[in-house]
C-alpha cells in the first residue's frame, strides 16, 4: 500500500458492505482511492471509493466484512488505488484482493507494488500481427488454436477436466515458453480453490521448498468474500500478470475462474450503490466494466498476456447479458464434452464445438487449415452415421462410410493425450506435442497410411511415432 498521511475522514454510515465516509472540506479522495479503516482486531479494513456524494462525503465499498465497524471511526486515505505486490516473490503464494498473503506461509518480501487500476496499453505498444500460442496439446493446437495475447473461453460442467487442463497449460507455458501464470479465483467455491492449490503442490506447479521456482501466483476472492472483493480480485490478478509481461518481458497465462462471477459481483455492488439496473437486473455499466478488464489483456511488443477464462452460463442461456458481453471479447472457445469424458478420452475437448478466430488461411499454414477442416468433416460424418450404426450395425454401411468411421475413431482416440500433471492418474508419462508433429500425425491417419493399425494404438499417445510403436506392442 502507498503509505502517506494525506487525508483523514470519519465513517458516517454503514449499510452492509457499503460505507459513507465524511472528509474535511477540500480533502475528498478521488474515485477508486483506497481508504484504510483501523479495526479492533488490528487487521484493518480497506475500502474503495466508488461515488462522490456531495456534502464532503464519499461512498465506498469494503474489501472485507464490515462486522464490528462503528460510526465515527477514522478512515485514512492511502493516497492512491489499492496497490498489490508484484514480481517473482508472488510465485507459489496465494493472495487476497488487497495483496495480502492468505496461505499461512509467512510474509512476502517484495520490492514493488502496483495499483490495480491502470490504463490499457496504448495502441502504439500493441503487437498487431496475430500469432499462434502453441500449447503442446494436440486437439487445441490443431482445431481451436489460441492466439498469443488472446482471450479464450473455457466451457465445461463439473468433473469434465477443467482443472487438469488448466494445470497442464500452466506446466507447458513454463517449460516450453519460459513463461509464468497467474490464477485469479473469482467468486468460486473455497473448496475448489483449496483443491486446486493442493493439486498444484502435488503436480510440482508450486514448489513448496523454493517458492521462486513455482510456475504460478494465485489470487483468490471466493464466494464467501463481500462483493467488493469479488469485483476487484480479477484486477489484482491482472496487475500481477502485467508486471511479468511489461517488466520481466515474459509470456504470461492469466486464468480467471470464473468471469461470470466478476459480472455478478459488479451487479451486486451496483445495486448496493443504488444505481438503476439494466437488462435482467445487471448493472448499467456492464459493458464498460468488462471492457476495462479485457482491454488490459493483450500482446505488446514486450510480451503477452494470454487469458483463459472459465465461463459459467446461467441457466444455459447464451443470450444472458453476462455471457453475451464476454463472448464479444473472446478469440477462441474450448468446450469440454461430458460424452468424451465418459468415453475416457482426455482432454475431453469437443472437436466440433470448440472454435477459434485463428483457424483461417493467412494466419495458420495452408496445410494446417486443410487438415483441421478434414478432421472436422470426418468427425461430423461419423456423428451423423452413429444413429444408423446404433440401429442397423456397422456392417450395413457402405464401404466408403465404414472407412470414414474407422478413421474417425482413430482420429477421436488420437486427439487424446497423456498430460504431465495427470501422470499419477494415467500411469503414462506426459507428452508435449509440437504443432508440426500434430499436423503430420493427423495427415497420415486421414490419408489412410495407418489404416491397418488397431484403433487402441492411438489412445493416450503423444505423436504418431508413439502410436506406431504402441501398435507393435499390441500385436
Swiss-Prot record:
Annotated positions binding ATP: 156-163
Principal location listed in the UniProt entry: plastid
Translocase is among the record's keywords: yes
Catalytic activities: ATP + H2O + 4 H(+)(in) = ADP + phosphate + 5 H(+)(out)
Location of this chain's protein in the cell: Plastid, Chloroplast thylakoid membrane
A GO cellular component entry from the record: chloroplast thylakoid membrane
Entry's EC annotation: 7.1.2.2
Record membrane topology: Peripheral membrane protein
InterPro entries xref list: AAA+_ATPase, ATP-synt_VA_C, ATP_synth_F1_bsu, ATPase_a/bsu_AS, ATPase_alpha/beta_chains, ATPase_F1/V1/A1_a/bsu_N, ATPase_F1/V1/A1_a/bsu_N_sf, ATPase_F1/V1/A1_a/bsu_nucl-bd
Assigned keywords, A-Z: ATP synthesis, ATP-binding, CF(1), Chloroplast, Hydrogen ion transport, Ion transport, Membrane, Nucleotide-binding, Plastid, Thylakoid, Translocase, Transport
Protein's UniProt keywords contain Calcium: no
One Pfam family of this chain: ATP-synt_VA_C
SUPFAM superfamilies for this protein: C-terminal domain of alpha and beta subunits of F1 ATP synthase (SSF47917), N-terminal domain of alpha and beta subunits of F1 ATP synthase (SSF50615), P-loop containing nucleoside triphosphate hydrolases (SSF52540)
An annotated GO BP: proton motive force-driven mitochondrial ATP synthesis
GO molecular function: ATP binding; ATP hydrolysis activity; proton-transporting ATP synthase activity, rotational mechanism
Assembly and oligomerization: F-type ATPases have 2 components, CF(1) - the catalytic core - and CF(0) - the membrane proton channel. CF(1) has five subunits: alpha(3), beta(3), gamma(1), delta(1), epsilon(1). CF(0) has four main subunits: a(1), b(1), b'(1) and c(9-12).
Family: Belongs to the ATPase alpha/beta chains family.
Function, in words: Produces ATP from ADP in the presence of a proton gradient across the membrane. The catalytic sites are hosted primarily by the beta subunits.
Protein name: ATP synthase subunit beta, chloroplastic
Organism encoding this protein: Trieres chinensis
Amino acid at each position: 500500500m502507498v503509505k502517506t498521511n494525506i487525508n483523514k475522514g470519519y465513517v458516517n454510515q454503514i449499510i452492509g458492505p457499503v460505507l459513507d465516509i465524511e472528509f474535511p472540506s477540500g480533502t475528498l479522495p478521488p474515485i477508486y482511492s483506497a481508504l484504510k479503516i483501523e479495526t479492533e482486531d488490528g487487521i484493518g479494513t480497506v475500502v474503495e471509493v466508488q461515488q462522490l456524494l456531495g456534502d464532503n462525503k464519499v461512498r465506498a465499498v469494503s474489501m472485507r466484512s464490515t462486522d464490528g465497524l462503528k460510526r465515527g471511526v477514522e478512515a485514512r486515505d492511502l493516497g492512491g488505488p489499492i496497490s498489490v505486490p508484484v514480481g517473482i516473490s508472488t510465485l507459489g503464494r496465494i493472495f487476497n484482493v488487497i495483496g495480502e498473503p492468505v496461505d499461512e506461509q509467512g510474509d512476502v518480501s517484495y520490492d514493488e507494488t502496483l495499483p490495480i487500476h491502470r490504463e490499457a496499453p496504448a495502441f502504439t505498444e500493441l503487437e498487431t500481427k496475430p500469432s499462434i500460442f502453441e500449447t503442446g496439446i494436440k486437439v487445441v493446437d490443431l482445431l481451436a488454436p489460441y492466439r498469443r495475447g488472446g482471450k479464450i473461453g473455457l466451457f465445461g460442467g463439473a468433473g469434465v477436466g477443467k482443472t487438469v487442463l488448466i494445470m497442464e497449460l500452466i506446466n507447458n507455458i513454463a517449460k516450453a515458453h519460459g513463461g509464468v501464470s497467474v490464477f485469479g479465483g473469482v467468486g468460486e467455491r473455497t473448496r475448489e480453490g483449496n483443491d486446486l492449490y493442493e493439486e498444484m503442490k502435488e503436480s510440482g506447479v508450486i514448489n513448496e521448498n523454493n517458492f521462486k521456482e513455482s510456475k504460478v501466483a494465485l489470487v483468490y476472492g471466493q464466494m464467501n468474500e463481500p462483493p467488493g472483493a469479488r469485483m476487484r480480485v480479477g484486477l489484482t490478478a491482472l496487475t500481477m500478470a502485467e508486471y511479468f509481461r511489461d517488466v520481466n518481458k515474459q509470456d504470461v497465462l492469466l486464468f480467471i475462474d470464473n468471469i461470470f462471477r466478476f459480472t455478478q459481483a459488479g451487479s451486486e455492488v451496483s445495486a448496493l450503490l443504488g444505481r438503476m439496473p439494466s437488462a435482467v437486473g445487471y448493472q448499467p455499466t456492464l459493458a464498460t466494466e468488462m471492457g476495462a478488464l479485457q482491454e488490459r489483456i493483450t500482446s505488446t511488443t514486450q510480451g503477452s498476456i494470454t487469458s483463459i477464462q472459465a465461463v459459467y452460463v446461467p441457466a444455459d442461456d447464451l443470450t444472458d447479458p453476462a455471457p453475451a458481453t464476454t463472448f464479444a471479447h473472446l478469440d477462441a472457445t474450448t468446450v469440454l464434452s461430458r460424452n468424451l469424458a465418459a468415453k475416457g478420452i482426455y482432454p475431453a475437448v469437443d472437436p466440433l464445438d470448440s472454435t477459434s478466430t485463428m483457424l483461417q488461411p493467412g494466419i495458420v499454414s495452408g496445410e494446417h487449415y486443410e487438415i483441421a477442416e478434414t478432421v472436422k468433416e470426418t468427425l461430423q460424418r461419423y456423428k451423423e452415421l452413429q444413429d444408423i450404426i446404433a440401429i442397423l450395425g456397422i456392417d450395413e454401411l457402405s464401404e466408403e462410410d465404414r472407412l470414414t468411421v474407422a478413421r474417425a475413431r482413430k482420429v477421436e482416440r488420437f486427439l487424446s493425450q497423456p498430460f504431465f500433471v495427470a501422470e499419477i492418474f494415467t500411469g503414462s508419462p506426459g507428452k508435449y506435442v509440437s504443432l508440426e508433429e500434430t499436423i503430420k500425425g493427423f495427415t497420415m491417419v486421414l490419408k489412410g497410411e495407418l489404416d491397418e493399425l488397431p484403433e487402441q494404438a492411438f489412445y493416450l499417445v503423444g505423436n504418431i511415432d508413439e502410436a506406431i510403436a504402441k501398435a507393435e506392442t499390441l500385436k
